[in-house]
């Protein structure tokens, strides 16, 4: 039997947001509003929140208390290690 390519909704959303960050569609410092992303991806906020937490662990976004999540600003020397 062949292998199945299967991604959860969270994985698909994580991949899409990661791609937008890497291509520059989402610039450093841009706030990532869960509700807006949920509307864009046609999902509830739960998989968006999970995707943003995954991207936070990867160092691509950061959470600030009482502010929310935003695309992380990185120094050039950090970019290679994080994104490649």
Descriptions of predicted regions:
Residues 1-84:
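Short linear motifs at protein or domain termini
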């Amino acid at each position: 039997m062949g292998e199945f390519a299967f991604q959860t909704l969270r994985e698909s959303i994580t991949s899409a947001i990661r791609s937008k960050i890497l291509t520059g569609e989402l610039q450093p410092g841009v706030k990532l509003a869960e509700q807006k992303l949920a509307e864009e991806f046609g999902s509830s906020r739960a998989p968006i929140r999970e995707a943003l937490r995954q991207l936070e662990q990867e160092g691509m976004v950061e959470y600030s208390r009482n502010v929310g999540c935003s695309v992380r600003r990185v120094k050039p020397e950090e970019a290679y290690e994080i994104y490649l």
